[in-house]
């Protein structure tokens, strides 16, 4: 017969003695723990404070991200405390990083509200990053179990349906961000959209910080963009679009802008990561209900994703955003102006595009994970790329990607349409050569393919001449722990 509550509360043991005892002794460390299929797993990179045992640091993170507080509380005995305690079950030293460890923690699935990214993150990252026992802490990876994953809707549209709508297969999609980001009038903004789409791009895009400022209110931007889209589609016979940024101060205003975009004929809208998890999930539900494609700009992510020892690895954001329901997310370029180690970027793209993940330590993927029926998310490569890098972009990123050439389109000396044409010709020439078996990534072959294509395309020749020496060869701050890799454009 089970014990009554009064009987249980009288039990005395080392674990339930009043006062402060180590987290590991409170039950948050269990080296013999057998991981269940239904457990949420989290991998933390932990730098303990001097003198703090790494096992105790891992147990502290497990405790403070689940049920623990700083002292023993008797009300634990009123719960299924053994079940609800997170368990740190493995601690490994990080190669070539003294006093830094990888801690594997397991969480009972019932600790989290179904389909709530806000609740999941409130536990996993809510309190532990300011914990004094650790000098630095980074969430490196997570495994979301099938049972919990199925409560999320996933991307509203997905890669396959998007390609069906565009009737475009076997090649990356092309886009550009309107530049300058801020200051254009609505009429001039719409002209940029028209010129870029008519020149051969599939998409134009608002930048992260264009919302509804005094120089151009959102309705003015939306209307002029749709005019440019419709005129370019009529002129080219292709399906065209522009990511209309509906990010706003309140969800009421976000929905208002989304409904207006739909009413005037847009088939896609855009939001920023800085909106927050609840807002992202909310508009993702709206996008699915209204058959709209949802583009996410990762604005603000590097404030907590870039540093190697503290914050949240972007691969975790990729998982969270795919669960939340976005169709596109900016995920790095390798060769552009933004942070991007080749192996890390490939890992991000795998997380967004694969239906099943296998452990791949060089790519930073630490857990097997089945994405169940959640659709795939299209990565977007944007930031400091140009047509002269086309062979590198296709090699590193593959076909299921949107290549966004902002300055690499609008900065063309002969105008926006010429810049778009240069990118379209470069892409088609490289894809054709690849399909014919050319060793296009070879630094002798790839550039020659572009030079040959430029013989019959003046805009491409001009672009190659202008940007031929432009590259961003900086060492990444975040690199693989289990493989050596170069970040250079090669």
UniProtKB/Swiss-Prot annotation:
This protein's record includes keyword Metal-binding: yes
Keywords from the UniProt entry: Calvin cycle, Carbon dioxide fixation, Chloroplast, Lyase, Magnesium, Metal-binding, Monooxygenase, Oxidoreductase, Photorespiration, Photosynthesis, Plastid
Active-site residues (renumbered): 179, 297
Binding sites annotated in the UniProt record for Mg(2+): 205, 207-208
The record's free-text note on cofactor binding: Binds 1 Mg(2+) ion per subunit.
GO cellular component terms listed in the entry, alphabetical order: chloroplast
UniProt xrefs under InterPro entries: RuBisCO, RuBisCo_large_chain_AS, RuBisCO_lsu_C, RuBisCO_lsu_C_sf, RuBisCO_lsu_fd_N, RuBisCO_lsu_N_sf, RuBisCO_lsuI
Pfam families, A to Z: RuBisCO_large, RuBisCO_large_N
Site residues by UniProt (Transition state stabilizer): 337
Cofactor: Mg(2+)
Gene Ontology MF terms: magnesium ion binding; monooxygenase activity; ribulose-bisphosphate carboxylase activity
Note from the entry: The basic functional RuBisCO is composed of a large chain homodimer in a 'head-to-tail' conformation. In form I RuBisCO this homodimer is arranged in a barrel-like tetramer with the small subunits forming a tetrameric 'cap' on each end of the 'barrel'.
Quaternary state and interactors: Heterohexadecamer of 8 large chains and 8 small chains.
Family: Belongs to the RuBisCO large chain family. Type I subfamily.
Role: RuBisCO catalyzes two reactions: the carboxylation of D-ribulose 1,5-bisphosphate, the primary event in carbon dioxide fixation, as well as the oxidative fragmentation of the pentose substrate in the photorespiration process. Both reactions occur simultaneously and in competition at the same active site.
Protein name per UniProt: Ribulose bisphosphate carboxylase large chain
Source species taxonomy: Eukaryota, Sar, Stramenopiles, Ochrophyta, Bacillariophyta
Name of the coding gene: rbcL
